[in-house]
Structure formats: structure tokens, C-alpha cells
Amino acid sequence: SENLKIDTMAIELQYLLVSEEPCKTFNSTPLTEELYEIGTKLDYMENRLGNDNPSVLQMKEYYSMLELRHWLFVKKTKKECEINRTYILYFYSNEGDCQTCEEQGYVLSYLHKKYPEMNIYSFDINIDNVALNTIKRAYNVVTAPTLLINDKNYEGFMSARKIEETIR
């Protein structure tokens, strides 16, 4: 947990440094990969300590804020630097009310490996946080799984093929 805090602080600092010259540093930044690694560590903590562990929930909320900030950065650089980049916001639930969420997670992991330049952000739909609630309202996210692919809302499970067709 302490290593996770250090990693997240490093990402915050790197974000500030990169945002000074977004077009110059966009392709060279390991920011995306580090965010992905922290997500993997968070998954490990969730599996070891449980979804409802207070430390896990707090870290998950903090990680969600890092993801939102990174997503905003990617959106900004995509527009300012004219970079063709796909981003997906994935809303899931761990509360037993989403039969296809785990499978959707596997599909997105597969796509991340196949297309490393694709940015995928995962959010627990049940986290009650002002920033996440703003995104959910703005994009009408009401159920899990929901994918926001380049700002378009897709409710329900999507296969890898269907997602690939959407981003072409």
C-alpha cells in the first residue's frame, strides 16, 4: 500500500511535468503504462483483501481520480496535438449485480495488449465521488457494464470484435 502511494505520487508529478509540453512529451511518456501497472496492483489488493476492504476502496477512489486526470490529459492532447488516439472509459460493478462485468474486463485487457496505444480507464460505477458522478451524469452512465468509447455511450457487454468495429 505504501509503494502504491509512492507510485501514485510519482504519476501525479509526471503528469504535471508532461502537461507543460503535452505535444512534445505525449508519445515518450510512460504515464499510461504506469497507470496500468498501478491498476494491476490495485486488482491484486482487491483479490487479496476483498472488494469491500476500506483500504482497497480508498485506493480505488484515489486511482479513479488519477485515471480521470489522465483521460482529460489524453483528450486535451488528442485535440491540441492532432493525435489519433482511442480512449475507453469502462464502468463496472463488483456488487454482484453485473453478470458480464468480469468478462468485459477480460475483453478490455485483451484489447489493451493488442493495441497498447489505446487508453482504457476502469471505474467502479458504485463509487460515490463528485468527479465520477459528474462524468456519469454528463455521459448518462446508469448501468454496468457501460463503455464510453471516444465519448460515445455503449451500454451492455461488447465483444472485442464489436469494439474494434466501433473504433475503426
Each model region followed by its residue ranges:
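Short, intrinsically disordered low-complexity segments
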Residues: 130-142
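Solvent-exposed loop/turn segments at secondary-structure junctions
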Residues: 94-97, 126-130, 153-155
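General small-molecule cofactor/ligand-binding pocket signal
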Residues: 121-124
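Local sequence-structure signature of Cys/Sec-based thiol-disulfide redox active-site neighborhoods
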Residues: 75-117
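Non-catalytic, surface beta->alpha helical segment in thiol-disulfide oxidoreductase systems
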Residues: 1-6, 143, 148-168
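Solvent-exposed, acidic/flexible segments
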Residues: 35, 59, 97-101, 156, ...
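Solvent-exposed, polar/charged alpha-helical surfaces in well-ordered, non-transmembrane soluble domains
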Residues: 68, 106-110, 161, 165
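Non-globular targeting/processing and membrane-anchoring segments
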Residues: 1-86, 142
